Amino acid sequence: TRNHSGIFDVSHMGQLFIYGGDELIKDLEKIFPLDLKNLKLNHSKYSFLMDKDAGIQDDLIITKINEGFLIILNAACKDNDFKILKELLKEKYKMVLDENRSLIAIQGPKSSQILNDVIDGVKDLNFMSGNWFLFDNQKVYITRSGYTGEDGFEISIPNNFADKLTRELIDKGSKLVGLGARDTLRLEAGLCLYGHDLDKDKTPVEANLKWAI
């Protein structure tokens, strides 16, 4: 992953789609410490779901899409996050914690070249931005992001097509990598892990993450 590219199956993470417009933006700004009104379409931000004392319930990535927002949640927290957000938003919006989509990450200095050979145009994405692309006539949402400290991409793809995509990436020279190695990579990069470096007893300020507020 440091020298070439590695593929990680991170489908255990939550993919939460919340559908809505300007009213949704106002409501989410009451929940997340972000300026979502000025977040550009198809751009992403790192943020937190916090309790009333600013304790971190989860850290997450929120992306503005045409339909509303796509929020990537930690696996151990996703069901509780969904419940909390449903209550806070008073069930005003359609919310889907999508179990029908896999999440495949390809990371490393060769990831852009390899993924672009399979899905044309992804190399033009900037860091922390994304868009819808087609793979085998299926809509996939790809962001230029990751959890390794390397250049890379995360691909939200229908479950039935995740295996085919992975095999094509392997055919182009990438290799499968386990989540234990991913944890080592994020440690080397100084990235936080919820449940270890972050928890509900810490605020973002106490966790030295003021830059994300």
Could you describe each region identified by the protein language model?
Residues 1-213:
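Basic, glycine/lysine-rich polyanion-binding surfaces/domains
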